[in-house]
Design a protein with these regions (language model features):
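Alpha-helical multi-pass transmembrane bundles of energy-transducing inner-membrane proteins
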Residues: 112-119, 123-170
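Membrane-embedded alpha-helical segments in integral membrane proteins
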Residues: 15-21, 64-70, 120-134
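The first (N-terminal) embedded transmembrane alpha-helix
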Residues: 5-17
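Transmembrane alpha-helical core residues of multi-pass small-molecule transporters
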Residues: 13, 37-40, 89, 140-144
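Short conserved micro-motifs on helix faces and helix-strand junctions that flank
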Residues: 11, 73-74, 87, 120, ...
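Transmembrane helix-loop-helix hairpins at membrane boundaries of multipass inner-membrane proteins
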Residues: 1-6, 20-115
Length: 175
């Protein structure tokens, strides 16, 4: 079985499923998509750790272009453990938090939560898996976007203001 693509699954799958949650707008279906994304990410990162027992590093060059020219994902022992850790935490959060989500958010906004959660997770996984600084910055921005949305979804009227304040602070820090 060809498993060269394993390093990209925890990044690409949540990133690909996030727009579906936004388009479908069904809370239960979005929850199911999120559980599937987190479960597959957790399983693939576990198998990646298994492959790392025989290798020092797993790499995946996008489009066949090597690292200095193209985009390359690289998983070594440390970021393999980190990827498995955040995938496991993401799966646990998805399974456990869904019960209390109805008290924290209006039902009509649940799909926003799952979209933002998937974006945040994909950004974190991308920062861990990427092998170049440019894509690390891109994934930090994706994760930040998801985090701003999660903060803005709060019931409190100050949530939107807090999200905007966090965004401005982050922009100043990046600059």
């Amino acid at each position: 079985m060809n498993t060269d693509f394993l390093p990209i699954i925890p990044v690409v799958l949540p990133l690909a499923l996030a727009p579906f949650c936004l388009l479908i707008k069904n809370s239960m279906f979005c929850w199911l998509l999120t559980v599937v994304a987190m479960l597959v990410s957790c399983v693939t990162s576990f198998f990646t750790l298994g492959q790392l027992s025989t290798q020092n590093e797993l790499t995946y060059p996008f489009g066949g272009w090597e690292a200095p020219v193209g985009i390359e994902y690289s998983i070594d022992h440390l970021n393999g453990v980190l990827l498995f850790f955040i995938s496991s935490i993401g799966l646990l959060l998805t399974l456990l938090y869904s019960a209390s989500l109805r008290w924290d958010l209006k039902g009509s906004r649940h799909y926003f939560f799952y979209t933002a959660f998937l974006l945040t997770f994909a950004g974190l996984a991308g920062v861990i898996a990427t092998a170049d600084a440019f894509n690390a910055f891109v994934f930090i921005e994706i994760s930040s976007l998801g985090t701003y949305i999660l903060v803005a979804l709060g019931k409190d009227k100050g949530a939107l203001l807090a999200s905007r304040s966090e965004e401005h602070t982050s922009e100043l820090q990046v600059t």
